[in-house]
């Protein structure tokens, strides 16, 4: 009698055991889920990012009703509304950057001023979300025959021109990528072409062969040899006099999704015009999956935050675990 009772007890349904097993399974599922997907948008197939390039117009310009003090809150409003993970700024002066960072403290900053490698002159700085990324390495180089010398200008540029760059590391996953942000000369085509070649060389020779992003005001329309070179379509001449195609061909994120859009002007002189050349770009490596890409026409009653439209793109960089 006792033996039969014991057998019945062993076969009896025990809810606590089932709940215990379910808890274990849930924990395992959650663990692998966190490994493969985190809240920032990363998954096992790549790193999802939202990037903006934004020429904010230098703040000492005599722009009257479009002066910096009358539009600085619109600039910050654009960043708040669209919430990019990374922003490449051009024409930013120290006091402009300070204002933006005070209003949007979640962004860290990478870069130096072009005239002295410190604080004098315009920056092509990079803003990045400090809650998501750390900085592995960073620097700035000058578009000249002496790219390590601050203020150097040997290619006939109307202005000193620079590129600031960084290797950013996603804190949660340890996955990393490079970001290069630049502003090419607005006058000299030979300077722009030499600058594009130097940029491609720096990308090719980066320490870690991880994906890269290039943002900037290229002062070059889509049919300019500079853009065709970066896309791997043609060869152009570098500072050493030789000509070759780039070894790091890129894609224009905007054109991946909008190949036939005609009105793509990005520098509009505060007029809000859309017909003309696109000179602001976000480039990524060939094969990158582009999710969204826009030229932003944000304005307040016909008043614009800058004389350039900001450009944004969301994409998945191929940085698997």
Walk through the language-model features, giving the residues of each:
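Active-site beta-strand/loop signature of hydrolases that rely on acidic residues for catalysis
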Residues: 49-56, 75-100, 127, 166, ...
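Charged helix-capping and loop-helix junction motifs
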Residues: 193-199
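Acidic/histidine-rich helix-loop elements
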Residues: 53-73, 142-159, 185
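Extracellular/periplasmic catalytic domains that process cell-envelope and extracellular macromolecules
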Residues: 43-46, 81, 102, 117-120, ...
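Short, solvent-exposed loop/turn elements at domain surfaces
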Residues: 58-65, 136, 189, 261-264
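N-terminal, active-site-proximal structural segment of metallo-dependent hydrolase catalytic domains
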Residues: 3, 8-20, 29-103, 116-122, ...
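Metal-dependent phosphoester-hydrolase catalytic domains
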Residues: 132, 190, 201-212, 220-321
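Structured beta-strand-rich core segments of catalytic domains in phosphoester-bond hydrolases
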Residues: 86-180
């Amino acid at each position: 009698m006792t033996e039969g009772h014991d057998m019945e007890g062993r076969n009896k349904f025990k809810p606590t055991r089932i709940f215990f097993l379910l808890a274990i399974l849930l924990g395992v599922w959650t663990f692998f889920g966190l490994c493969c997907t985190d809240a920032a948008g990363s998954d096992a197939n790549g790193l999802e990012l939202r990037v903006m390039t934004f020429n904010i117009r230098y703040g000492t310009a005599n722009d009257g009703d479009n002066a910096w003090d009358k539009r600085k809150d619109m600039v910050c409003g654009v960043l708040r509304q669209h919430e990019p993970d990374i922003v490449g700024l051009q024409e930013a002066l120290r006091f402009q950057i300070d204002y933006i960072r005070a209003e949007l403290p979640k962004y860290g900053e990478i870069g130096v001023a072009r005239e002295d490698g410190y604080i004098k002159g315009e920056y092509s700085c990079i803003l990045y979300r400090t809650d998501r990324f750390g900085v592995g390495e960073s620097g700035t180089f000058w578009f000249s025959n002496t790219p390590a010398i601050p203020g150097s200008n040997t290619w006939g540029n109307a202005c000193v021109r620079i590129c600031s760059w960084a290797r950013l590391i996603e804190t949660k996953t340890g996955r990393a990528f490079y970001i290069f942000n630049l502003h090419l000369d607005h006058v000299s085509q030979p300077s722009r072409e030499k600058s594009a070649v130097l940029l491609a060389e720096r990308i090719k020779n980066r320490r870690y062969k991880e994906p890269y992003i290039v943002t900037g005001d290229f002062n070059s329309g889509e049919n300019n040899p500079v853009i065709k070179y970066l896309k791997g379509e043609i060869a152009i001449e570098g500072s050493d006099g030789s000509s070759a195609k780039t070894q790091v061909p890129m894609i224009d994120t905007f054109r991946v999704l909008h190949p036939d859009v005609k009105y793509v002007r990005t520098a509009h002189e505060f007029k809000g015009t859309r017909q003309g050349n696109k000179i602001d770009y976000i480039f990524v490596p060939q094969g990158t999956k582009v999710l969204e890409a826009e030229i932003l026409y944000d304005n307040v009653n016909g008043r614009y935050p800058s004389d350039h439209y900001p450009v944004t793109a969301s994409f998945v960089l191929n940085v698997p675990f």
